[in-house]
Amino acid sequence: MASGSVCRMDVAGWSTARRVTKQISVGNVAIGGSAPITVQSMTTTKTADVEGTLQQIYALAAAGCDIVRCTCNEAEAAEGLAQIVPRSPIPVIADIHHQYKMALAAIEAGVHGLRLNPGNIRRPEHIKAVATEARDRGLPIRIGVNAGSLDPALYDKYGGATPEAMVESAQQEMAYFHEVGFDLIKISVKASSVPLMVEAYRQLADVTDVPLHLGVTEAGPPPAGLVKATAGIATLLLEGIGDTIRYSLTADPVEEARAGRQLLEALGLRERKNVDLIACPSCG
């Protein structure tokens, strides 16, 4: 499947081109290909707090969240995941920070996928060790590039966090994965700047057909954070770019899930759960 291919989506009488991507699965949820665009969020509890985390996950699922991400930054978090995953109503992804061994521990705990930041785990042997284990378990990995934590070498090469630097970071990580025969990949190239984020995703969509996870980093609290995140995510979705989305708000994660679901419904990309209430200012 060549990058840049599109399929047609009939949305409320309009024909919209959606970029065709490879399809992968996170647990029982398909991402990419012709699968519906999914909503993700992230828990704010300590992952070691099993009951508190599960309570939040159930609330997220009720709000329309399809996939949830939990931090795995210490042994206690990995132990918590081992109890959370079998009781979660939706697939669980482990968010890995700086220690590749935490990724291996999360895999052992039974998570449905991983998120790795190339700017935080940079040694090729560590990256390949995680990819090899994920390959053997059939688990997908998101390459989570962030403009604020790029590899210093790329930052110096491009004179800053440019779209080109972010795309190259993703491509470098993907090359390490391919060296060990791992291809269950999705990618994000997030930034707190909407124009930077949008351009990075556009450039990435031109060079790969892996599923893309959309988001604006540190969008902030509502309402400004909602506006900022929507500006970036909706722009790309209307261009046919994006297979899964997350609002990153300084707020209860349930608000993230609701916002993501409502955006997809507003764009005609997911079926509405609720009736639209339309207020006409000129009506009596």
Which stretches of residues belong to each language-model region?
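N-terminal amphipathic alpha-helix/helix-capping segment at the start of soluble metabolic enzymes
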Residues: A2-S41, R135
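Structural preference for beta-strand elements that scaffold enzyme active sites
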Residues: T21-Q23, P36-Q40, I67-R69, P89-D95, ...
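Active-site mouth loops of central-metabolism enzymes
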Residues: S34-G52, T71-N73, I90-H98, G119, ...
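Glycine-rich, proline-tolerant flexible connector loops at the mouths of alpha/beta enzymes
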Residues: M42-V50, A61-S88, R115-R123, I185-V194
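Glycine-rich phosphate-binding active-site loops on the catalytic face of alpha/beta enzymes
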Residues: G64-D66, A109-P124, V216, E239-P253
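Alpha-helix-loop-beta-strand connector modules within alpha/beta enzyme cores
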Residues: E74-I96, A129-I141, Y201-L212
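Hydrophobic or amphipathic alpha-helical targeting/insertion segments
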Residues: K101-R142
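Catalytic alpha/beta core domains of metabolic enzymes, predominantly
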Residues: N146, L154-G284
